[in-house]
């Protein structure tokens, strides 16, 4: 704490806020060896050098001795840190087998250690340390008579276990053994001699805690990756988020702090430096490391590692500073384009001192600082602000005050708090002007930071909570650069996205709550997002939300600008789309005071396939699909005799032909109507068919699965074969199947038969599964399709037929079964023309083989669609099915299929979207995009088995399916099940 002479002749104490060094880990010196090698030099001298650093900070120890004493609750409250490290890292889970969700593009664990084994090691080491600590405590509690032999033995075991796991990594990095390169220097630092159990008596409980933390941090230096620290999960931050948002590369941060003297990595980010001296104590580097620490495989990771830093040191050679130096620093930083200023300094005894008003009211300061956000540490006296602050709102900039929480999420015992103090506007406390309304908290205890000597250390204080907020702002202003000109809106984003802590709402202890970095980079309220349609003249078309909500029969009559929540909240966990929409986006906009910010949302999030699995029923829908396949299978297999009757293979149960005077047979068939999940089951529960057969002419009329009747390929006579998502036989017929159908066949001679037919599907979606469809008239609430089919069937020899056909599919507001929650995307629909070649063969021994392959080309109907087919889409599908009756027993049936469901091989889609066209200003306009589509080929294999049991009164069926889709999030799935039906 420094006494200085400040403005107006008053004595002011201005300090960097309680940068308490808990311990420091060394930088590994590089030395030349023969043969040349990069190794790690001696550790002990670096520890010795740090003794002076401890000495310099002695005045602060008295303030936080209680904090050290309270470290035991730290271990107790986050026991997962040691007991189960995966729980400590939480959702980020950097030690899982799949590192991408946390690390993103960073290369982690490239030194031979695997991520899962590192996690397993710390799981065991945590439990071992608990045992050491328990024995140590018992011995110390006994006083002079305490026996430390058991604790010493357990500690030796911990060291041996660490040597077994980490020895090779230490050897590779230091050129020394585990003992010489790591363990011995650290044990010596704490005065521990494992051959002398009495040496353990010298360490207090807090010293033991510090030893194990340093043991942990030291070993993690050898992982070959950046350090992961507790604060990352707490503030909901991952390196991947930083990568997505741009690393902070287009943001300039102002650092008003001590000089960064020895950290050459951080110095690379400092593009300009000023100040009254080069005085340093490591505080500036520690603060900066949390903002811009490089993601380089070692040390501290910052939230915005590529941000530029303008630095100013207001402290003179004596380590003191006054308001005049602070004012000069602010002007220098803001004049050099710093849009967020981190100030981890303040006046002891207050959360926000009145002196700040004088600084910001100065004309020179206010003119330069008006477009910057100032992030100020709250201070470390553990006081609650009681005095109001007279505040000049006309001149003073946007401000965020940051307090500290501990590792259990409670306010730090040293952190100052806002209380009920207010920023007074002409002696009046107005709504939103309380200090607590501008107060946020972030982790500030035991923070891993740069020691400014090339290594890392742990420090505590509000000084280290503030840079987390500054780093989050740097990400914001990198992703949305124009926010640098909107400091109030930027401040609002940080404060409004905070996670509530303490008493509900804004409170005198935690203010608005806990910093949430991910939430700040996300929409504050999805319900307020909007997107723009492009009108027929190619112009953005916007309409007030109140006009969009006007409805007729519960559905809007217009949709130009719409709430994106109706899209996003649908949250489908699976969408069976026939084309890859990767790289295609639409843009939603969030109103923010005088500006907006945009969000690129994958186009696929507003596209709906024909087999939808919703977020609130994903597992139930899967089970329903599985059960449905069982039911169809049992009902669809041909078997002779028995008290239970298997249906014909196409699902229809045929009655005996009805004789008539015309010489033609008439057959009426019925079958259960299969469900289309995600759609309403209107009308009768059964499908039906009337078949009229003459000498050369066969006519069929019906309601239901017309695809089987029209395709007429032997061995491919199950409706599931024509499912565009699951089967591979003529999917164009499958997309139009389910409603009325008709087919006419004429025998040209004994071998050749020609046919013509039509089928249609007209179904409404079940909006109880898709709540978004209750609010907007999208065109996707109803799927309508029809198909015309022309075929020729040639008998190559008895029992072997070759079938060729042409199919034209018309879809309204859809593309190959895919629809959109934006009515304009597929406004006038599409037409698809397909050619199919099939072979049906009776192989004898009650065995049938069916093969079908389809190639198709799709074009759009008319113009004005938001998603345009600019180059016809080419798609394919195929299936091969082998069916054996009497597989094991006389009347059982087995069926093996191999298929490639419908998918788009090639083509070009075009979109017109309204998006930001100038990222420096946020200006929006219409952008036309061309996307080449295509995806990895999906493949599927399926095995079905059914037989009658219990003297043919009951039946058993088994089902198994494997799907391989290299382009999907889940590249391989396996499904299996069985069913027993018992008859009485």
Label every model-predicted segment:
Residues 290, 312-315, 443-510:
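Hydrolase catalytic cores
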């Amino acid at each position: 704490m420094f006494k200085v002479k400040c403005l107006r002749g008053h004595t002011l104490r201005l300090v960097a806020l309680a940068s308490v060094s808990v311990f420091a880990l060394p930088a590994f010196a590089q030395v030349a060896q023969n043969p040349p090698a990069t190794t790690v030099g001696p550790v002990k001298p670096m520890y010795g050098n740090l003794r002076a650093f401890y000495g310099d900070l002695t005045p602060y120890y008295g303030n936080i001795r209680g904090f050290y004493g309270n470290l035991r609750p730290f271990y107790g409250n986050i026991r997962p840190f040691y007991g189960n490290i995966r729980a400590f890292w939480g959702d980020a889970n950097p030690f899982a087998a799949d590192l991408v969700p946390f690390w993103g593009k960073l290369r982690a664990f490239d030194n031979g250690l695997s991520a899962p084994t590192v996690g397993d090691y710390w799981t065991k080491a945590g439990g071992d340390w608990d045992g050491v600590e328990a024995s140590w405590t018992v011995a110390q509690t006994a006083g002079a008579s305490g026996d430390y032999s058991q604790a010493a033995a357990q500690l030796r075991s911990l060291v041996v276990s660490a040597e077994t796991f980490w020895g090779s990594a230490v050897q590779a990095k230091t050129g020394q053994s585990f003992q010489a390169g790591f363990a011995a220097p650290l044990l010596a630092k704490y005065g521990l001699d494992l051959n002398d159990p009495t040496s353990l008596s010298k360490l207090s409980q807090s010293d033991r805690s510090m030893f194990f933390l340093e043991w942990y941090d030291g070993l993690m230096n050898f992982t070959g990756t950046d350090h992961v620290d507790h604060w990352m999960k707490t503030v909901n931050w991952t390196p991947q988020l930083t990568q997505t948002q741009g690393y902070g590369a287009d943001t300039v941060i102002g650092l008003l702090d001590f000089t960064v003297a020895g950290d050459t990595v951080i110095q690379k980010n400092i593009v300009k430096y000023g100040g009254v001296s080069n005085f340093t104590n490591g505080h500036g580097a520690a603060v900066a490391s949390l903002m811009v620490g490089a993601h380089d495989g070692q040390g501290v990771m910052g939230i915005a590692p590529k941000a530029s830093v303008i630095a100013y040191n207001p402290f003179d050679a004596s380590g003191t500073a006054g308001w005049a130096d602070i004012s000069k620093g602010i002007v220098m930083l803001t004049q050099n384009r710093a849009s967020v200023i981190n100030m981890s300094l303040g006046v002891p005894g207050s959360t926000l001192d009145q002196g700040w008003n004088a600084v910001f009211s100065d004309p020179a300061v206010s003119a330069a600082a008006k477009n910057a956000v100032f992030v100020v540490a709250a201070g470390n006296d553990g006081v609650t602000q009681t005095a109001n602050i007279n505040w000049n709102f006309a001149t003073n900039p946007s401000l965020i005050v940051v307090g500290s929480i501990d590792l259990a999420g409670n306010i730090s015992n040293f952190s100052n708090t806002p209380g009920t103090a207010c920023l007074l506007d002409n002696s009046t406390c107005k709504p939103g002007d309380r200090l607590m309304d501008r107060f946020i908290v972030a982790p500030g205890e035991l923070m891993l930071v740069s020691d400014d000597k090339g290594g890392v250390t742990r420090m505590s204080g509000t000084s280290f909570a503030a840079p987390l907020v500054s780093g989050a702002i740097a990400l914001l202003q990198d992703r949305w650069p124009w926010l640098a000109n909107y400091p109030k809106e930027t401040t609002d984003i940080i404060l409004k996205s905070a996670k509530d802590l303490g008493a509900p709402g804004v409170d005198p202890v935690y203010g608005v709550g806990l910093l949430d970095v991910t939430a700040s980079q996300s929409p504050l309220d999805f319900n307020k997002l909007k997107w723009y349609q492009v009108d027929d003249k190619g112009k953005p078309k916007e309409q007030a939300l109140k006009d969009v909500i006007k409805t007729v029969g519960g559905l809007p009559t217009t949709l130009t600008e719409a709430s994106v929540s109706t899209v996003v909240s649908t949250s489908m966990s699976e969408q069976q789309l026939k084309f890859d929409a990767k790289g295609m986006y639409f843009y939603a906009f969030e109103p923010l005071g005088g500006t907006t910010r945009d969000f690129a949302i994958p186009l696929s999030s507003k596209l709906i396939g024909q087999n939808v699995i919703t977020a609130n029923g994903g597992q139930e829908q899967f089970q329903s699909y599985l059960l449905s396949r069982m039911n169809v299978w049992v009902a669809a297999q041909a078997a002779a005799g028995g008290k239970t009757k298997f249906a014909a293979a196409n699902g229809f149960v045929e009655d005996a032909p009805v004789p008539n005077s015309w010489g033609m047979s008439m057959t009426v068939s019925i079958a259960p109507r299969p469900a289309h999940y995600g759609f309403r089951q209107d009308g009768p529960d059964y499908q039906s068919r009337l078949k009229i057969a003459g000498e050369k002419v066969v006519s069929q009329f019906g309601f239901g699965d017309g695809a089987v009747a029209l395709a007429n390929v032997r061995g491919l006579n199950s409706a599931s074969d024509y499912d565009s998502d699951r089967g591979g036989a003529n999917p164009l017929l499958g997309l139009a199947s389910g409603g009325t159908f008709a087919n006419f066949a004429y025998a040209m001679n004994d071998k050749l038969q020609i046919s013509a037919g039509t089928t249609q599907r007209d179904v409404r979606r079940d909006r109880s599964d898709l709540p978004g469809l209750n609010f907007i008239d999208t065109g996707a609430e109803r799927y309508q399709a029809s198909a015309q089919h022309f075929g020729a069937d040639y008998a190559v020899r008895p029992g072997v037929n070759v079938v060729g056909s042409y199919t034209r599919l018309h879809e309204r507001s859809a593309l190959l079964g895919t629809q959109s929650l934006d009515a304009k995307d597929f406004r006038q629909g599409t037409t698809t023309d397909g050619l199919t070649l099939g072979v049906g063969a009776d192989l004898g021994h009650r065995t049938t083989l069916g093969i079908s392959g389809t190639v198709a080309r799709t074009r759009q109907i008319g113009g004005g669609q938001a998603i345009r087919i600019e180059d016809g889409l080419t798609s394919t599908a195929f299936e091969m099915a082998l069916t054996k009756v009497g597989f094991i027993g006389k009347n059982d049936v087995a069926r093996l299929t191999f298929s490639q469901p419908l998918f788009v091989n090639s083509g070009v889609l075009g979109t017109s979207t309204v998006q930001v066209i100038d990222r420096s200003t946020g200006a929006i306009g219409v952008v036309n995009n061309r996307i080449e589509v295509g995806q990895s080929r999906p493949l599927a294999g399926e095995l079905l088995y059914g037989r009658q049991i219990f003297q043919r009164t009951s039946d058993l069926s088994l089902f198994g399916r494997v799907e391989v889709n290299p382009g999907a999030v889940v590249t391989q799935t396996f499904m299996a099940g069985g069913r027993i039906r018992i008859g009485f």
